[in-house]
Amino acid sequence: MIVRTTDEITGTHRDVAAANWRSKRIVLADDAVGFSFHETTIDADSVSEFHYRHHVEAVWIVEGTGTLTNHETGEEHPLRPGTMYLLNGHERHRVTCDTTMRMLCVFNPPVTGQEIHDETGAYPPAVQAS
């Protein structure tokens, strides 16, 4: 059994930040459970481009509002607490935040925790945790 709090993660290698977001990586590849689980916060009035070519991601919005844009279809979806979106087709997408958004994210395959988005908005293919 694994039990963790976000307080334990703050300031460790599991607490990853970029220009407009912060992700607390609660469950990672080295936990050996087949997925990773993150609490991610994206800043208000920001736009983020993502394209998880090597991962499937499920996202549950718990706080804030914004818009999800599917670049492949042009469809836009409002984001608010209680909304889930699943990127099961590796869709290139944009998240536009009207307010600070907090979300819970599940990745398969799991991430190691230190991945950085490349120029296309993707994480690299899954690698072994060190």
UniProtKB/Swiss-Prot annotation:
Its EC number is 4.2.1.108. It catalyses: (2S)-4-acetamido-2-aminobutanoate = L-ectoine + H2O. It is an enzyme of class 4 (lyase). InterPro entries: Ectoine_synth, RmlC-like_jellyroll, RmlC_Cupin_sf. The keyword Glycoprotein does not apply. Pathway: Amine and polyamine biosynthesis; ectoine biosynthesis; L-ectoine from L-aspartate 4-semialdehyde: step 3/3. GO terms for molecular function: ectoine synthase activity. Keywords: Lyase. GO terms for biological process: ectoine biosynthetic process. Belongs to the ectoine synthase family. Catalyzes the circularization of gamma-N-acetyl-alpha,gamma-diaminobutyric acid (ADABA) to ectoine (1,4,5,6-tetrahydro-2-methyl-4-pyrimidine carboxylic acid), which is an excellent osmoprotectant. This is L-ectoine synthase. It comes from Mycolicibacterium gilvum (strain PYR-GCK).
